[in-house]
């Protein structure tokens, strides 16, 4: 108290007040506050104060050799007095202006390469078109979106290795570049950035933008591909939207789109094969999208779509723990349930065995055009809050939720028999039977559901069985909301298992995905999809099957030829001949097969009747289960171009045409490849030339294993014996000579010996 009184006394004298309020601050605590640490405490003030000085900048001494002391107007650019406390020069802001106008220029060649993503964005915006602005309520839902157009799909670890290798090649540290894309990008970037003067850190940062997918969980109403997300702030507000068409596409969006199309085609095709899982894996491994192996894309691409996730599960990759039903992604947000089997009777008195989930659970449902929150108990829908773009989308969500609830009134609303089948002609499981039934017609379902009066709740309205909105009444437990339901944000992935029929289950045994969930929507892929698997030949129609089958035989002729003579049954069962069967008229398949197999047997038995071209031509017909009959054919029919076309047993036709002079085969006018051996040449020529260095011992001896082709002989050791298939379908036993000197005489001897061995 005393001190305060004293201070008050002092302040009452005007001179003291002047001293205390006007003199400089030299209190230690304050000085400490503003001078301790490197962090500037008042940057704005510091800047003003510095710039008011004549020489606020310091620079390296070398600057005096590059910049004149005075500019054209005679103003001083740098001071001759050194900066206190360092050996740097004090420089005027005018020096910066001089440098910008007259200083040295660097090459700009690397800028578009390093800042590629920015340059491309400008181009997209320049060529994009902005349409009118519409004012309306925006139903936005948060989705995980790609915010970085034009990137490759490397993991952050892979990208880190590439960046280190490109930007800091001499730094110590192990870098393992294994994937094809890593090696390709590294090579390309090293070439592009030779002599680059842009700061390495900046180059590294920009490379990261180019190599890694960046995702954010953002509210979106409309397009979710990265070229729309980059202009999100321009195209949608709280109550308005602006139509926009991007001025260009980027590869990452194209990869996502093409991957979905390829995965759907593959799952659909695998479903109808004898072993769906094995077929699916074979197709994934032999397919390329835009020149990149599909399995590599699947490992890196985070796209979540039913077919894509089935392919990932088959490859042993982790996928999202949400499950799919009726085209909606369900994520349980609370509650739990146990499963038990229960038999129920439909309105048509058909018995269905369904797996009932007992217990109270809450789910979010997210679809392409509608989202919902579902609360359910055992076989009872408690509440469903739906939001969607239009009446149709809302109806779809309601049907799926009603079926999912397994309420008795759903099962009783079934009229007629449930006998929906999948592509492989197998009956669908009961839940999908119900779903398909009501997706066709849900009138009775909605009418039987029941109606209730509703309270007036902000942002919610009712919906009647005819799908009209109402503020007084609604279908029991169902409301329409203006607000969307956010997609599940977590990027967590779980270990799953997949069975032979492509049903994907989590570790608790819940089915997350099945082929029934794969959309039938067909799009046109943005990138070229190359299906090398024979199972996908039919994707492009009958002509493609025909051409591909013959191309395959010609490409693999060496091994086909051996199997034809040694193990024909195994050859006939090859899956590469499966697609061809769909081209042969059903009634004729067995007869054609029996006829061709008999013909082939005669060729094997009767000397000198081996005919390469004829074997290639007729081989696919022998793959069907044969019927024994005495029928002879001069031509065989295949269904292409909308009608039956004939393949002649002897001679050429528009379907199958072999040109002797060029040794090339054309199928329906398309080139199917060249035969490397001359089908008409006698035994002596090619074989004896190739058999130099081998001694022919006589006819085939099975103890020495299956027949090799001539090309495989080189792997024999000296003195080793082997059976070998020579041009006309005959097999002889040979031994590799122990000495090289006698090779010259071999060709004459070989010719004689072959004749002797055969005869």
Swiss-Prot record:
GO terms for molecular function: RNA binding; RNA-directed RNA polymerase activity. It comes from the Viruses. GO terms for cellular component: host cell mitochondrion; host cell nucleus; virion component. Its main location: virion. Keywords: Cap snatching, Eukaryotic host gene expression shutoff by virus, Eukaryotic host transcription shutoff by virus, Host gene expression shutoff by virus, Host mitochondrion, Host nucleus, Host-virus interaction, Inhibition of host innate immune response by virus, Inhibition of host MAVS by virus, Inhibition of host RLR pathway by virus, Inhibition of host RNA polymerase II by virus, mRNA capping, mRNA processing, Viral immunoevasion, Viral transcription, Virion. A motif (Nuclear localization signal) lies at residues 736-739. InterPro entries: Flu_PB2_2nd (IPR049110), Flu_PB2_6th (IPR049114), Flu_PB2_C (IPR049115), Flu_PB2_CAP-bd (IPR048298), Flu_PB2_middle (IPR049111), Flu_PB2_N (IPR049106), INV_PB2 (IPR001591), PB2_helical (IPR049113). Belongs to the influenza viruses PB2 family. Plays an essential role in transcription initiation and cap-stealing mechanism, in which cellular capped pre-mRNAs are used to generate primers for viral transcription. Recognizes and binds the 7-methylguanosine-containing cap of the target pre-RNA which is subsequently cleaved after 10-13 nucleotides by the viral protein PA. Plays a role in the initiation of the viral genome replication and modulates the activity of the ribonucleoprotein (RNP) complex. This is Polymerase basic protein 2. The lineage of its organism: Viruses, Riboviria, Orthornavirae, Negarnaviricota, Polyploviricotina. The gene is PB2.
